[in-house]
């Protein structure tokens, strides 16, 4: 998917990018490739692949109608090189984006990238989701939490749901169907008061299958969740 294909596909979906937005995606690509020589950000560095498998894939929840261009508070857990939240922010500038990542080098990259892109209302924090999930400044503060290829739903639920307001939504982007994962995550979702409201499949323009699972938070998360760093992965609920 060339940049021109990317712009044209978005236009067909009703999103006509400004010259500034096109420039932001171009700068994003160039910075990603440059920084990738210093720290391991992605195995995908060829321009057409980045536009398809990183940029287009990241904004799919918007294209599929699951996110509006409103000043909602969005948290991205384990965003790595900024996916999916920063491409979303470029497309929908009204989003207020917070990223938590466990690797400080990635946070350094994202901080400089946001400056290069001229993004406002973006915040970056270095640390573990389990620790921030017990911090009152973060817990129960977000309208949406996104996670792209971070963990299985059984683990991901505990890492993300505590951050949501009641009625807030987890948007999980996956490359494989989540049916089996959701079966395994039933107990975790029950304990965390999360309800699956959408399990959506779609295709990238090249025909590759992708999946979006949306979980709504129904009640306050019990205080004991999330457990200490590492435990959700070692002993899933």
Curated annotation (Swiss-Prot):
Keywords noted in UniProt: Cytoplasm, Methyltransferase, rRNA processing, S-adenosyl-L-methionine, Transferase
Gene Ontology CC: one annotated term: cytosol
Enzyme Commission number: 2.1.1.-
Pfam families: GidB
Uppermost EC category: transferase
SUPFAM superfamilies attached to this UniProt entry: S-adenosyl-L-methionine-dependent methyltransferases
Major subcellular site: cytoplasm
Molecular functions (GO terms): rRNA (guanine-N7-)-methyltransferase activity
Gene3D superfamilies cross-referenced by the UniProt entry: Vaccinia Virus protein VP39
InterPro entries referenced in this protein's UniProt entry, alphabetically: rRNA_ssu_MeTfrase_G (IPR003682), SAM-dependent_MTases_sf (IPR029063)
Family: Belongs to the methyltransferase superfamily. RNA methyltransferase RsmG family.
PANTHER family, A to Z: S-ADENOSYL-L-METHIONINE-DEPENDENT METHYLTRANSFERASES SUPERFAMILY PROTEIN (PTHR31760:SF0)
Protein's job: Specifically methylates the N7 position of a guanine in 16S rRNA.
HAMAP family given in the database record: 16SrRNA_methyltr_G
Protein name, as recorded: Ribosomal RNA small subunit methyltransferase G
Lineage summary: Bacteria, Bacillati, Bacillota, Bacilli, Lactobacillales
Gene for this chain: rsmG
């Amino acid at each position: 998917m060339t940049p021109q294909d990317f712009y044209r596909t978005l236009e067909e979906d009703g999103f006509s990018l400004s010259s500034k937005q096109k420039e932001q995606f171009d700068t994003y690509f160039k910075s990603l490739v440059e920084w990738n020589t210093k720290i391991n950000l992605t195995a995908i560095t060829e321009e057409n692949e980045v536009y398809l498998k990183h940029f287009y894939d990241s904004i799919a929840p918007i294209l599929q109608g699951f996110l509006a261009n409103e000043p909602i508070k969005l948290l991205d857990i384990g965003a790595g090189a900024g996916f999916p939240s920063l491409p979303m922010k470029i497309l929908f500038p009204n989003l207020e984006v917070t990223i938590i990542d466990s690797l400080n080098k990635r946070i350094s990259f994202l901080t400089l990238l946001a400056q290069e892109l001229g993004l406002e209302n973006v915040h970056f924090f270095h640390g573990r989701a389990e620790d921030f999930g017990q911090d009152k400044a973060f817990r129960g503060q977000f309208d949406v939490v996104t996670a792209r290829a971070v963990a299985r739903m059984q683990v991901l639920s505990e890492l993300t749901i505590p951050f949501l307001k009641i009625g807030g939504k987890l948007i999980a982007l996956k490359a494989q169907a989540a049916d089996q994962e959701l079966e395994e995550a039933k107990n975790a979702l029950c304990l965390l008061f999360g309800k699956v409201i959408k399990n959506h499949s779609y295709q990238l323009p090249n025909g590759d299958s992708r999946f979006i699972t949306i979980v709504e938070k129904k009640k306050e998360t019990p205080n004991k969740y999330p457990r200490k760093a590492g435990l959700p992965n070692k002993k899933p609920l």
